[in-house]
């Protein structure tokens, strides 16, 4: 079956690496279930995705379906530094996106790939408005935990007290969740947060939350059962994670902006089981130079082997390039590797990896849990502080190295060493590993055929197919043709008494196909005479309602 014959969903992503990865993973899951998926984002990161992952213009087969890519220009210069300022960039992305996405949808329809559903991720809620304007359904992929979805929901609607200028240290009790201390609440909700633009960007989706017919989440029922069941009474959520595990798309295209250093796997192969600490703080967290120095000295003192990912900052970010202490690599020798970007999924699944020192972003959290990997929690801001609370206190797979930006301190080398040793040896490490393997088994059961997430995703796919069939039946309900002129039934431009003139008749036809061109309207209405099929086919070029009406009448 060719890709053009499949039900088509159109995914629109914000440009952040932490947004692209889960939405692309969802796209591959949907394709594996037999859909045609188009993944779309701005060209400024599209060019990096093409370069790092070998993306081409051809649809790529994934399971029973296909995935393809389209990128659009945001109309800013390639090196425009304002992309780093969300208060400036998000309005620009919305302005351009609301114009170009409908054009892309129309072009796909003209090329035989009509779109049946749009799906977006946070920061670009206007995609739901675009879908609504086109008469298409929309869905949204939430890229944080169900607990954070609930926290933002209750904050936005003022349902429970949160830290405020009058009560900075207010703990937060949300139904079906453990008590969150003030510094365990998503930090963008702090009244003193230095990132108010991120609060605005995230909460923007909540103003549009009634428009998507489904909110998909990269989590699974068994992991967050109580809060998922509670939130399901407030909004149409479906847990479909972990998305990064896809048995039908093991070698499918990735969305990394930098090419991963796969040679590191060969080095890992030479190390003993559970002996290597993996350190990565994601795609947007940049530490102070002083903190990097303390982590480096703590690593050397602990004696553990390690892989440390040190991603260089974006040239326009304003961050300085971090450097390692003098002589660090020489002292570490063959027991340490420092890389710019890594194949994280492969490292976390490798038997030589002992634990993951992580910023606790949700993508990394899901990858560690699904890989059965204990963690050392090093959250900085946003949902990371909430995820760290769950990893350590609820899922019991981690030790906490810091509490995030509210703590506002550099973690000294002796504490770094203590946490590394606690996570890699002794009874605490064994207990964490046992719990991590339990969550790995639960995650694998969830995404396996017939598991909770697989059932939820299949239900979503079935609903998209049902909607697609309904859309197709409406578009084909314009009528049937009796009259033929040179094998083509045509509407004429002339009007009689303010109505479109009747169709001329002829006795010939071509290929047994009747074609209906766009009729002209009079008095704000389009009136269509009775049409009958020829050899069971009627092809309609385009019918546009005038004043919101298309009327069918029998002749």
UniProtKB/Swiss-Prot annotation:
Which InterPro entries does UniProt cross-reference here? UDP_glucos_trans, UDP_glycos_trans_CS
- Give the first-level EC class, as a single word: transferase
Keyword flag DNA damage? no
* Reactions accelerated catalytically: (E)-cinnamate + UDP-alpha-D-glucose = 1-O-(trans-cinnamoyl)-beta-D-glucose + UDP
- UniProt entry tagged with the keyword Metal-binding: no
* CDD domains, alphabetized: GT1_Gtf-like
Q: Which UniProt keywords apply?
A: Detoxification, Glycosyltransferase, Transferase
Q: Which EC numbers does the record give?
A: 2.4.1.177
**Tissue expression notes:** Highest expression detected in fruit, with lower levels detected in flower and petiole. Barely detectable in leaf and root.
In Swiss-Prot or TrEMBL terms, this protein is called: Cinnamate beta-D-glucosyltransferase
| Organism field | Fragaria ananassa
């Amino acid at each position: 079956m060719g890709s053009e014959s499949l039900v088509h969903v159109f995914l629109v992503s914000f440009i952040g690496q932490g947004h692209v990865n889960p939405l692309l993973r969802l796209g591959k899951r949907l394709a594996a279930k037999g859909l045609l998926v188009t993944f779309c984002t701005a060209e400024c990161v599209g060019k990096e995705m093409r370069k790092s992952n070998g993306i081409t213009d051809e649809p790529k087969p994934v399971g029973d379906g296909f995935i393809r890519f389209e990128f659009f220009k945001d109309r800013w210069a390639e090196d425009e530094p304002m992309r780093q300022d969300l208060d400036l960039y998000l309005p620009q992305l919305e302005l351009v996106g609301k114009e170009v996405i409908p054009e892309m949808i129309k072009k796909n329809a003209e090329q035989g790939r009509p779109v049946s559903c749009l799906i977006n991720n946070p920061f670009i809620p206007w995609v739901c408005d675009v879908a609504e304007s086109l008469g298409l359904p929309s869905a949204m992929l939430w890229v944080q935990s169900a607990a954070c979805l609930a926290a933002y929901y209750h904050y936005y609607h003022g349902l429970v007290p949160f830290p405020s200028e009058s009560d900075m240290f207010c703990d937060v009790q949300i139904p079906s969740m453990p008590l969150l201390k003030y510094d365990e609440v998503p930090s963008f909700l702090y009244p003193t947060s230095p990132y108010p633009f991120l609060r605005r960007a995230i909460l923007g989706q909540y103003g549009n939350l009634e428009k998507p017919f489904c909110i998909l989440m990269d989590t699974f029922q068994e992991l967050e059962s109580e809060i998922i069941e509670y939130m399901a009474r407030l909004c149409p959520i479906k847990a479909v994670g972990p998305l990064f595990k896809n048995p039908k798309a093991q070698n499918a295209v990735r969305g990394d902006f930098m090419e991963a250093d796969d040679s590191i796997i060969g080095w890992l192969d030479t190390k003993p089981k559970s002996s290597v600490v993996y350190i990565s703080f994601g795609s947007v967290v940049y530490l102070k130079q002083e903190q990097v120095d303390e982590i480096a000295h703590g690593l050397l003192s602990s004696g553990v082997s390690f892989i440390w990912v040190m991603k260089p900052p974006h040239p326009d970010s304003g961050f300085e390039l971090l450097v390692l202490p003098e002589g660090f690599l020489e002292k570490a020798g063959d027991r340490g590797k420092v890389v710019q970007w890594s194949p994280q999924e492969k490292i976390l699944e490798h038997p030589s990896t002992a634990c993951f020192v992580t910023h606790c972003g949700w993508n990394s959290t899901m990858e560690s849990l699904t890989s059965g990997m204990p963690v050392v929690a090093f959250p900085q801001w946003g949902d990371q502080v909430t995820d760290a609370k769950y990893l350590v206190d609820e899922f019991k797979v981690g030790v906490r190295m810091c509490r995030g930006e509210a703590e506002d301190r550099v973690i000294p080398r002796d504490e770094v060493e203590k946490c590394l040793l606690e996570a890699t040896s002794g009874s605490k490490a064994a207990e964490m590993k046992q719990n991590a393997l339990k969550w790995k088994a639960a995650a694998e059961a969830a995404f396996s055929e017939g598991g909770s997430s697989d059932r939820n995703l299949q239900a979503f796919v079935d609903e998209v197919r049902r909607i697609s069939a309904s859309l197709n039946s409406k578009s084909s309900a314009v009528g049937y043709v009796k009259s033929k002129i040179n094998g083509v039934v045509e509407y004429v431009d002339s009007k009689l008494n303010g109505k479109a003139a009747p169709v001329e008749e002829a006795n010939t036809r071509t290929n047994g196909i009747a074609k209906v061109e766009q009729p002209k309207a009079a008095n704000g209405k389009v009136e269509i005479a009775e049409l009958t099929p020829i050899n069971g086919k009627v092809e309609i070029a385009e019918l546009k309602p005038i004043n919101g009406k298309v009327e069918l009448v029998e002749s």
